[in-house]
């Protein structure tokens, strides 16, 4: 019996960061997504700008009065991230469909790109960005990472 198509799941940078920084909330839920991806139950998809957002968040964890990571740890985390076989969609393909989502939801443009991708694929969007999540509620298909099962 042939396996059916793999269900796409859109993840944003707030989820991807949790794969790499162990002191984050809901890392168990984020790692469950990775396990399901590894078992070919889901396909992880994101707009291509995720490739810039995640390293930026990792670098930010090295800065400030109480850095969470050393520079070497940040480099290792970024290398780990770059080795993940995420399927990315060129952000430029999503710009026009994201624009009305910014105005209707009052969210940041880069967040609207994730939402536009999820809607174009008919896929859920999983986020751990509380401000974004609260701003766009109720939004069908948007799942808070802590609620992901």
Residue ranges and their predicted role:
Residues 1-49, 63-73:
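Short, well-structured N-terminal submotif of metal-dependent ribonuclease cores
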Residues 1-8, 115-149:
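Acidic, PIN/NYN-like endoribonuclease modules and their adjacent C-terminal/linker elements
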Residues 3-4, 83-126:
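Active-site neighborhoods of divalent-metal-dependent phosphate/nucleic-acid chemistry enzymes
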Residues 12, 111, 129:
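Acidic active-site catalytic centers that drive phospho-/nucleotidyl reactions
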Residues 15-16, 50, 93-94, 114, ...:
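Alpha-helix capping/helix-boundary segments
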Residues 40-41, 84, 121, 139:
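Structured helix-beta-strand junction loops
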Residues 53, 97, 134-135:
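Phosphate- and divalent-cation-binding pockets in alpha/beta enzyme and binding domains
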Residues 55-85:
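Active-site-proximal, substrate-binding regions of enzyme catalytic domains
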């Amino acid at each position: 019996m042939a396996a059916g198509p793999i269900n796409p799941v859109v993840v944003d940078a707030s989820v991807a960061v949790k794969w790499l920084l162990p002191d984050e909330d809901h890392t168990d839920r984020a790692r469950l997504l990775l396990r399901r991806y590894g078992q070919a139950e889901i396909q992880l998809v994101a707009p291509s700008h995720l490739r810039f957002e995640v390293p930026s968040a990792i670098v930010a964890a090295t800065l400030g009065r109480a850095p969470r990571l050393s520079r070497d740890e940040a480099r290792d985390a970024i290398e780990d991230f770059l080795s993940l076989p995420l399927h990315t969609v060129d952000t430029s393909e999503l710009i026009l469909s994201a624009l009305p989502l910014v105005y209707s939801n009052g969210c940041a443009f880069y967040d609207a790109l994730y939402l536009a991708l999820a809607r174009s694929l008919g896929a859920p969007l999983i986020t751990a960005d509380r401000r974004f999540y609260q701003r766009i509620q109720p939004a069908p298909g948007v799942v808070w990472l802590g609620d992901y099962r």
